[in-house]
């Protein structure tokens, strides 16, 4: 798995000193240069067993993304994910929002102020490598704050994770045409 805990929980730390992508830059594209600058923040965090949560480069007050993965949180049963021109539009995140519709889970794509983390019951990163990697807590050292989400994945994350895995592994019907069967490979 992408994170050592797999579909367990991983702690994260907010980094306000390094920007993953420049405003009006190429953050929305899969370009190596977008991630090279973030190594200065991710390597020391990973040595401490932490993932990194990056904020918007312009104001440093809105959640952007988790290292190389998208962020989402659950607030009162609503799946909330950042809307930003500086993050890669994740296929996994789009798939999870589609599954939210299937499962009648409301979802929003909008700017998320850091302070809103205190109102969320669940938080996770999502992307190709991790599918969903839930977040146990987010430490904000600059504000001397910690936001806790529990030591086990929450109910919405579990529901979405299992729905996605069931489609990927053929245990549930793929009504969206996401899977492609390759024969004679």
Predicted regions and their residues:
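Helix-start/capping segments and mature chain N-termini
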Residues: 1-185
């Amino acid at each position: 798995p992408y994170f050592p805990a797999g579909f367990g929980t991983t702690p994260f730390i907010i980094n306000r000193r390094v920007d993953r992508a420049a405003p009006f830059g190429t953050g929305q594209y899969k370009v190596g240069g977008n991630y090279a600058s973030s190594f200065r923040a991710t390597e020391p965090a990973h040595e401490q067993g932490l993932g990194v949560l990056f904020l918007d480069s312009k104001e440093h007050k809105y959640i952007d993304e988790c290292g190389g993965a998208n962020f989402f949180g659950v607030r009162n049963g609503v799946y909330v994910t950042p809307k930003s021109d500086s993050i890669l539009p994740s296929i996994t995140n789009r798939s999870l929002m589609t599954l939210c519709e299937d499962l009648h889970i409301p979802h929003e794509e909008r700017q998320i102020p850091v302070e809103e983390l205190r109102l969320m019951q669940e938080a996770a990163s999502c992307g190709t490598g991790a599918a969903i990697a839930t977040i146990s807590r987010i430490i904000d050292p600059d504000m001397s704050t910690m936001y806790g989400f529990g030591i086990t994945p929450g109910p919405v994350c579990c529901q979405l994770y299992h729905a996605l895995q069931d489609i990927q592994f053929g245990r549930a019907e793929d009504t969206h045409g996401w899977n492609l069967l390759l024969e004679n490979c």
